């Protein structure tokens, strides 16, 4: 489900994702965002902002130490990125993030079946990836165009 074909700046990705630029810079520093940026980076950044903050029950993580992405976090970000261009992605598509796995489900019936079959009291995060993909064209269109500042050029002596 390709939304646009244009490249986006790091700032535009953050704005379209509804996040501060600091999230985009953190994501860039951890290798989540690499240039050039396209529409899939917007959804990937949103997912990164969620999963980078999760600490599963029973897991200890010092707040002051630099936190590199764990495998499940990277997998969640990449699954979200792939959902943007997946022709099976619908507004009902959801990304389930569990401590040991990531699952994309497309329909409400699949969500119910997944809940019954796989969750059974487990902690999970459900992200509305399909809705975010559906909102991408408007989110990107609403990003204000920034004009480059004019540089002060030396005026010729008169």
PLM regions and their residue ranges:
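A short, Lys/Arg-enriched interface patch at domain edges and termini
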Residues: 42-83
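Acidic, low-complexity intrinsically disordered regions
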Residues: 19-21, 68, 128
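Solvent-exposed, well-ordered amphipathic alpha-helical segments
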Residues: 5-7, 28, 45
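Short acidic alpha-helix initiation/capping motifs at coil-to-helix transition points
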Residues: 2-5, 39-43
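Major-groove DNA-recognition helix of helix-turn-helix-type DNA-binding domains
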Residues: 17-41
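Polyanion-binding surface elements
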Residues: 1-24
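Intrinsically disordered, low-complexity regions enriched in Ser/Pro/Gly/Gln/His and often acidic
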Residues: 16-18, 65, 124-125
